[in-house]
Amino acid sequence: MIALKATEMQHNNNALQQQQQLQHQLLQQHQQQHQQQLQQQLNSPDNNYIWATTHNANISRNNAMLQLQQQQLRAPWITDCNKQHHINNNNSMNVNYNQQLTQQPQQQQQQTQYMQHNYNNYTQQQQQQHLVPATTSQSNSHFYQCNQQQQQQQFLAPTTTTAAVVVAAAHQQHQTQQQHQSQQQQQHQRQDYASLQMGRQLGNFETGQSVLTLTTPTLTPTTTRNIEDTLGHLLSDTQTDRVAGCAGFAVPKVLPNAIDVLGMGIPTGVSSLPLQQTFDLSLGQGSESEDSNASYNDTQMNEEQDTTDTSSAHTDSTSYQAGHIMAGSVNGGGVNNFSNVLAAVSSSRGSASVGSSNANTSNTPARRGGGRRPNRSTNMTPEEEQKRAVRRERNKQAAARCRKRRVDQTNELTEEVEQLEKRGESMRKEIEVLTNSKNQLEYLLATHRATCQKIRSDMLSVVTCNGLIAPAGLLSAGSSGSGASSHHNHNSNDSSNGTITGMDATLNSTGRSNSPLDLKPAANIDSLLMHIKDEPLDGAIDSGSSLDQDGPPPSKRITLPPMSTMPHVHLSTILTPTGASSGSLQTPITSTAPGGFGSAFPVTSNGSSINNINSIGNNMNSPTLNAHNKVPKERPNTLAFQRPLGQMHLTMANNKAGGPTQIQGVPIQTPSTGTFNFDSLMDGGTGLTPVSGPLVPNSSSTNKHPLELPTPTAEPSKLVSL
């Protein structure tokens, strides 16, 4: 109340200042009029009135200064009267304030009229008094003096008029500054009045944001800040998401029409300030049942907030209307008469939750948060107190259960997180171990691949001859020879299928390894071969088989007729060695069974060589040696080629040393195994055979053991293409 009175007194002082400003404005208008008149008189050709007008202007300025001094002396007396008036009328403060607001314009008008009337009378009198000497001075007796005075006034007139203009301009600037200050003061007064009115309206409304003390005599910075915070929270609609979804409570929208409620206009002639706005604080599904956590109402505000329940302590489930607070109804007297206003608001509230049997309709004022709430309210029945105690105990238990449940859930989640972290760490370690093992295995595989390739190449070097395992040294010896020995690759003509088969003498030309097998032949191989039983040749055994199936298939082999069908071909003529000069046939052909090692044995004479070849060929087909042949077949290296029998003529030369051997008139000058290579026949290919010097047998090469024959690398050889 003291704050209200202080603001009203300030308002009265401001009104007095406004009156003074109006008086200053009137004086300014009069001064401007006089200045205009002076300028007109100075510009006129008649100079007789110069002295009178300047004198009148000076008199008018003096009168204005006197009036201002009188007003300044009168202002303190008016303020003292107003203070005494407000002190004597504390109970009817609002009425007097409103009456004074209505009476102030009337008083101002009366004062301004009175002052203006007096001022006009005074100025008229002064003008009359000063114009008389100006008129009487115009006589013939004082003509010379008048002329002198007129001349002096003419010289002094510009100076006096310029000084008057400068003074008037300075006075106008001072007046504009005063007007600007007065406008700022009026704005501050409006703001103070608006804040005061909002404080009246919000003094009975609970928002839980600030606390208005009951003993504050004036508007302190703390209270103004609290009012601003309250307005900010009321105008912002961000409270709906604050505790949404907590224990079934929903925060209501507080003051949706707060802008309409807070009327910012200053009432001018109103004797009462009715507040008839409706504040809806109803919850969405609020009820007053005893079995619901949403049974908080305004009576719960009077208890101490000693629980940490999820519900908001300053919200309730009641919907009420703010009562009509009449400004003249506060008649209790005294300074801190604030309980009457609260009682008026609480008495006009609506019933909480219509249709509920357990609704609390207490008229206790709800505090706005902060501080310790009273233990009991004034209008509380014993039943309501008991219900409140039961509800309070139940809320405490529910809050404790909620806290315990929240702690348990947090602990469970923490343990689960720790377990997952441990599991992830173990999985990372396992991944590292597996990665290391994978790298080691890859390294071992990379280092072992070269060894595997070498072993495979060594295994592929194993060859067979007529189904028998033959050493690589014998094959290499059979495909090449030195200059002092002749090597006859013994081929067989299979009469059952009509194909020429024999040992592969070109295996060494394919880039394979030439490391021989660890085969240790018997010491007396001649006596061992003599005991081998002769058996017929099995047509199913293919002498061209190998491990990797090299060469063309059997269907591409050259087919030659058997020697028995050829006319006039004698065995002795075929096996007769020829000289090197005639380019003789180096491949003997026989009609007997194929022999594996026939080409590896020395040739002493024609007859002995034939017997040796026949005996060896017959002995090589024994089942004793065939039983050791358990390896896969070798790739065929012969070409199955059908030729007409009529065109096949072997033209052999005489049994001379230099007679050439011809097939259909073409002399054969290169040694071969009796097998025509497919590539060499088609494209010329790579059918390269090592050729030595003159193939003339001597005694040094014929007496050697079969396994002691020279290898292809024994002597340098020549490569001749077909």
Swiss-Prot record:
The modification Phosphoserine is found at S515. Residues 283-300, 506-516 have a biased composition (Polar residues). Disruption phenotype: Loss of isoform D causes embryonic lethality. GO terms for cellular component: cytoplasm; nucleus; transcription factor AP-1 complex. Residues 387-406 are annotated as: Basic motif. The gene is kay. Residues 413-420 are annotated as: Leucine-zipper. Its main location: nucleus. Developmentally regulated transcription factor AP-1 binds and recognizes the enhancer DNA sequence: 5'-TGA[CG]TCA-3'. May play a role in the function or determination of a particular subset of cells in the developing embryo. It is able to carry out its function either independently of or in conjunction with Jra. It is found in: Nucleus. Mammals typically have four copies of fos, Drosophila has a single gene with multiple transcription start sites giving rise to multiple protein isoforms. Residues 173-188, 308-317, 350-364, 477-498 have a biased composition (Low complexity). This is Transcription factor kayak, isoforms D/sro. Coiled coil: none annotated. CDD domains: bZIP_Fos (cd14721). Residues 173-193, 283-317, 350-407, 477-519, 683-722 are annotated as: Disordered. Residues 385-448 form the bZIP domain. The keyword Transcription regulation applies. One of its GO terms (molecular function) is DNA-binding transcription factor activity, RNA polymerase II-specific. The keyword Nucleus applies. Belongs to the bZIP family. Fos subfamily. It comes from the Eukaryota. GO terms for biological process: collateral sprouting of injured axon; compound eye development; dendrite morphogenesis; dorsal closure; embryo development ending in birth or egg hatching; follicle cell of egg chamber migration; germ cell development; imaginal disc fusion, thorax closure.
